[in-house]
Amino acid sequence: MEEFQVYLELHKAHNFLYPLFFQEYIYALAHNHRLNRLNRSSLFQNGDYDNKFSSLIVKRLIFRMYQQNNFIISTKNLNQNTFFSHNKNLYYQIISVVLAVIVEIPFSIRFISSLEGKELVKSHNLQSIHSIFPFLEDKFSHLNYVLNVLIPHPIHLEILLQTLRYWIKDASSLHLLRFYLYEYSNLKNFFIPKKSTLNPRFFLFLYNSYVYQYESILFFLRKQSSHLQSNSFGILIERIYFYGKIESLLKVFIKKFQDILWLSKDPFMHYVRYRGKSILASKHGPLLISKWKYYFVNLWQCHFYVWSQSKRVHIKQLSKDYLNFLGYLSSLRLNFLVVRSQMLENSYLIDNVIKKFHTKIPMSSIIASLAKARFCNVLGHPISKSTWTDSSDSEILDRFVRIYRNLAHYYSGSSKKKNLYRIKYILRVSCVKTLARKHKSTVRAFLKRLGSDFLEEFLLEEEQVLSLMFSRVFSVSQRFYRVRIWYLDIFYINDFVNH
């Protein structure tokens, strides 16, 4: 990227992006973006460069786009438009890939400029998905209620454009972006197949920009509520926009309504987001969390013009309900302990309640995914994987082992990992049935001929790794299924369906 830094320098007063659409090096950078993990010199090689990623072709595309008679093409003339019907793949792929690179430039420059003169702390462990769970394990024991939020998608494209308008000041780029989004939204139902090969980076960038704007407003309201509440000369009246200090009401309500003072100020509130879901946890009772639910709904409806459904926001009590987040079912378990305390001749019984963070494997969803991938039926009974019978024995076994390791690796933080026995059983029997089907034999005859030890050598490798980490006081298998372990090298949830 350092080689292109000179070309990517923008004028600070204008931030013009439109001329970059006609620079050839942008297309080389866009097409070879995935090679950033390889040698940087490969960007200048022609081995992986496609001629269709060219500024000349994009010039023709943009010219033909603007030559269309209608800004939004109706359904009547869709079939008559030869440009969109014959060149739809080329149109969407090239424009989306190039837009993804160009619109990120202002954000990258702002990020780099903000880090000038500052030492950037690099911690790869914080990038792991499992790094969230130790935080929840430490914090959730002090919390009571959680607001489980499913972030809604914007219903109008102008909302996305207004979000980008804060960062991109180039009117020509915004106009081209608006034109492309409107054309895509009107044509995708007719021409874009379900299994499209479009570059999702651009649409992911739009969604992240929208979520960033939403979270910025949310955090601003949170800070404003705390700041206004900290003033001793007034009280905060609960309203949508968190404003309305009335000094004259202080003398009337200060004695009778002391509890109002902390309704909007909660130092124990925590916010976590992953993909399209977020959680807002609080230490206080249901009244405060209900108010935050009301604020969420009004924020979406008033600012983003999104009609929020009630099923998108759920209030859960951690001691009673399970929280479905990041593939785990999390909750707080209440352990009641009775302690006898004796002072001189008097003895007392003290009841103590200890909250413990509990994580559970969602077996119903895992079995549903395994059934969808044809490893078992809907009841969890293993079946053969018929589509893999053309592969070699070692390749079939390696696929099943890799699926089990991914699941065991991710769900190693569960409080009770007995359900992993069931997952292992499904995959092992499915593997044996697949191999037996390939060799046109029965399961019993196949196991009798080869023996069952060849499966144990692969599927128990996770336990063999743990044997080097812990002492052999107990058996490794028992320790593996009793100890909760959070790994800090998991950057995404593995999709075992495609393995």
Curated annotation (Swiss-Prot):
Function in brief: Usually encoded in the trnK tRNA gene intron. Probably assists in splicing its own and other chloroplast group II introns.
Q: Does the keyword Lyase apply?
A: no
Q: Name one GO cellular component term.
A: chloroplast
**InterPro entries associated with the record:** Domain_X (IPR024937), Maturase_MatK (IPR002866), Maturase_MatK_N (IPR024942)
Name of the gene encoding the protein in the UniProt record = matK
| Domain of life of the native organism | Eukaryota
Q: Which family does it belong to?
A: Belongs to the intron maturase 2 family. MatK subfamily.
* Main localisation: plastid
Instruction: Please verify whether the record's keywords include Transmembrane helix.
Output: no
- Quote the subcellular location field of this record: Plastid, Chloroplast
Species of the source? Batis maritima
GO annotation, biological process: mRNA processing; RNA splicing; tRNA processing
The protein here is known as Maturase K
- Keywords of this entry: Chloroplast, mRNA processing, Plastid, RNA-binding, tRNA processing
Task: Give one GO term, molecular function aspect.
Answer: RNA binding
HAMAP family in alphabetical order: MatK
